[in-house]
Regions:
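Glycan-recognition and catalytic cores of secretory/periplasmic carbohydrate-active enzymes
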Residues: 1-225
């Protein structure tokens, strides 16, 4: 049911096809897939996060609401957020990564798992649906979560789970949430001066390799201009 290889990703693809072609067939199929997704997750516990968890599904539901004009999708989005928030750990200011089971939660901060992807998803949902920050985060200490994410240092620079991905997410959420935007430039420059290295990067792909790092560097130059 997730974004990367499940129904949530299929819904987003179908809606993009509908936006491009205006063929209602794509919208109808997206709604059917959405119904199947909602029914599927009622009977199971999912992961937190954008790539493989509740957040990716919530983005798909928000887009369905936007393209169909049906308000009930907002309630589904909020239900998914509340389910995800059951995995929030205030001692970490993060949502637990339970890929290894609830008995062994991990404090993962990345686009794919953890706070970075979840913050990005809810920022997107806010822009798509108009749901407020109070509605989306409810009892979550948003500023502390953002601060914790921004202070996370990674050992690699890939988009998926490295420093480049975190910095791009940080730029977007600071802008959407109106949270100390000027600090992004200082933070990005600090990590670039201190840690950027591609000597050990053997993957040439976008999400986990050199292409993704190149995209970040272009993004950095664009933002500085």
């Amino acid at each position: 049911d997730d974004l990367i290889q499940g129904r949530a990703g299929i819904i987003i693809l179908l809606l993009l096809m509908y936006k491009t072609t205006q063929d209602k067939m794509y919208l109808d199929i997206a709604q059917k897939v959405g119904t199947n997704l909602v029914e599927s997750i009622q009977s199971k516990n999912c992961l937190a996060g954008m790539a493989h968890g509740y957040s990716g599904m919530a983005v798909a539901m928000a887009l369905l609401g936007r393209y169909t004009g049906e308000e009930n999708y907002k309630e589904i989005v909020l239900e998914l957020c509340r389910k995800e928030d059951q995995l929030f750990d205030s001692s970490m200011n993060n949502w637990c990564d339970i890929r290894e089971g609830k008995e062994h939660p991990r404090n993962t901060v990345a686009w794919c798992h953890g706070s970075a992807g979840i913050l990005l998803a809810r920022a997107l949902i806010h822009k798509i649906s108009g749901l407020t920050m109070d509605q989306l985060f409810k009892d979550i200490p948003l500023n502390q979560v953002i601060d914790q994410m921004c202070q996370t240092e990674k050992t690699d620079w890939c988009l998926c789970h490295g420093q480049a991905g975190l910095l791009i997410v940080e730029r977007y959420i600071r802008h959407v949430f109106g949270y100390e935007e000027e600090k992004w430039y200082e933070n990005a420059a600090k990590y670039l001066d201190k840690r950027l290295s591609i000597e050990d990067v053997l993957n040439y792909g976008m999400m986990q390799g050199l292409v993704g790092i190149g995209i970040f560097l272009l993004f950095w130059e664009w933002e500085r201009d």
